[in-house]
Amino acid sequence: MPELTSLAQYLLAITPAFLVCAALLLAVPRTAPRTVPLLRVFVHILFFVLARDAMTAHGYWQVAAGGLRFTAPPLVLLALGAMSLGLVASTCWLESEARRQIRWLGMRPVLSVLLGVVGAVLIIALATGLKALFGLPSLAPVAPSMLPLLLGFALAANCYEELLFRGLLQQQLRAWLPACRAALVSGLLFGLCHAFLATTVTQVGAPILVFTVIEGVVAGLVYCRAGLLGASLAHGLAIFALAAGWV
């Protein structure tokens, strides 16, 4: 099947980076000085950035100044979503010490979901306003039959992303910074991790950086009150709306 061939080629392309990152995680101890767990977090993030940017070269998504579109075949999207959830589980297993510090929920699960939805609405509203201000075009809406698959993929993939940037990175930063400043720093670093995608992989430039900084800071603030569940919903639903062509 062409889909399986394409997926195999993608996995083969990211395997060298995976092996180097795995070797680093084996070499860097899980415990000891405070800076050591943070170094492990950056290794996880670096692998994520490499794997994400490789999706562009394999035609799995297209990023434009006014939106994004997942162009991978449905079977590949399903596989990538499942792999994202597998990476969530394996990362939690590898980082067992850091996992215990993660804020998974807010005070109440329902409130976490509500704040996650509010965060997504805020990200979408800010993105819509900026697009109107700078006259950026929107992509055409996708077929309704694709929406369930897009929603599932967006939530799964961005759950992994939020685990790295909020559950691990932001939570580690709380050892040195107040909650809001840690959210700001994690959001800015999140945007910075899209710089190569913005300037080299796609050459879209500033729109990607502006959107991802907004997205990262909002998700970071949501994490402070609603935990990883809320942050994942805010991020995942915003990406879903963008990929669906609704923004």
Task: Indicate residue ranges for each PLM-predicted region.
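Transmembrane helix-loop-helix hairpins at the membrane interface
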Residues: 10-19, 23, 125-247
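Transmembrane alpha-helical segments of multi-pass membrane proteins
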Residues: 36-51, 108-122, 180
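Arginine residue identity/basic-tract feature
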Residues: 30, 34, 40, 52, ...
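Juxtamembrane helix-loop-helix connectors linking adjacent transmembrane helices
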Residues: 4, 61-81, 86-158, 175
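N-terminal, membrane-interfacial amphipathic/helix-forming hydrophobic leader that caps
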Residues: 1-98, 243, 247
